[in-house]
Amino acid sequence: MNIKKFTGVKGFMPFHEGEALTKWASLFSKNGPILEIGTYCGKSTLFLSEGSKKNNQFIYTIDHHTGSEEHQINEEYFDEEIFDRSTNKINSLPLLIKNINLFKAYNIVPIVRESSIAAKDWSSPVSMVFIDGSHSLDSAMQDFKSWNTKIISGGALVIHDIYENPEEGGQAPYHVYKHALQNGYIDFERVDTIVCLKKL
């Protein structure tokens, strides 16, 4: 698997963490499809896609594509390339579609909805859920509560941006991680700020 080709894709997934995503996707997708919350332009999605291909599994990736709080105008991660002047809003969907076609990652299925709304209509089990959407505590915890029951026993929950020290980063993903450990999950593996938990 040549995953170095994803290095230049717009996104916030460091290569060594993306490499871990690919490995976990390859392992857990043997038992079913994978669901990602928080697509942005699809960098992490491509890592997941590459790992799942050998098992002929799909990656369902959910995002409203109007950006998180930090992507908006005058915020830290505002990016002119994904700003749609015709609507005066962030729109990362066109770049995601471009990346899917560029890398022929046709096992990626974009879902343009709010995560919690999509979960209400979702009935199929998944082998792995990757939470990397909004990093507010309410949103991150809602993502966990909405999708936790969809993960099969022995499946994986992956959470990005885990910082024990508040000075290094936001605490919402870390709180969700600790909550999951108290609610049916155990540590499986960690690479820097991305952690994989296994569901009992």
Language-model region placement:
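S-adenosylmethionine/decaboxylated-SAM
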Residues: 2-12, 18-200
